[in-house]
Amino acid sequence: MEAVAATAVEFWDARYEGETYAYGTEPNAYFRQRLDALPPGRLLLLAEGEGRNAVYAAKRGWEVTAVDFSDEGRAKAQRLAVAQGVHINYQVGDLTTLAWLRPGRYDAIGLIYAHLAPADRQAVHAAAAASLAPGGHLLLEAFSPRQLGLPSGGPRTTDMLYQPAMLAEDFAGLALLENYELGVVLHEGSCHAGPANVVRLLATRDSNSELTYSI
C-alpha cells in the first residue's frame, strides 16, 4: 500500500500551521455525545488533526492514542493538551500503512472526518474493526455525497465521501447500533462551518466475535 502523497501532507501541514485551530478546539458533537455514554478506557483516534477530540477524551479520563500524518497537526494538538492539562499519545504516521494496528486493544475507536480513497478506506476500516477489544465501540462521522456543492468542508470528489451502505459493508464484522445520513449545521472552526450532509455510525464488537487482520 503506497504511503500518503507528499502533496497531501503539505496540504494538511499548511492548513494546520497557523495559530488558529482550523476546526476549532471543541470536540465533534456526535463524538462527544456518544463518547460520554461510554466508560473510559483505551481510545484510538485516526486522522486526529489538531487534537480537539483527543484532548476532550483525555479530560474525560480516556487513555488516548492519536494518529495523523501532519507534524503541524501534532504540534497544535500537543499545545492544546498542555493548555488543558492533559496528556495524549500522538503519533505521526501514514494511516494507510496500518502501523497503528493493535488487534483487540482499544475500548473505543474514533474516525471523525477520516476520509480516504476507496482501497485505503476498506483496509483502514477493517484494521480499525480488528483493533477493537471485545465489547468496544467504534464511532464515525464523515461527509456524504450530498455534501458536494456545499461550502462547509469535505472532499470534492464522490469516491472520497461515505454512505451508510458502504459503511455497513466495511464494518460487516461489527454489530451496527447506528448508521444513518442526515443534514446538520456545523460549528467546527472556519473549515467546518454551515449546513452540511453527514453520515454517522456507531458500532460495537460482540464479546464472542473473532476479527483478525494481518498486514
Each predicted region: which residue ranges?
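Conserved class I S-adenosyl-L-methionine
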Residues: 1-38
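Conserved SAM-binding strand-loop segment of SAM-dependent methyltransferases
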Residues: 84-96
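A short acidic, Gly/Pro-enriched loop at the edge of an enzyme's catalytic core
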Residues: 100-108
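A short SAM/SAH-binding and catalytic strip from SAM-dependent methyltransferases
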Residues: 107-121
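A short glycine-rich, Lys/Arg-flanked "PGG" loop and its adjoining helix->strand segment in the class I
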Residues: 122-134
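Conserved beta-strand signature within the Rossmann-like core of class I S-adenosyl-L-methionine
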Residues: 135-143
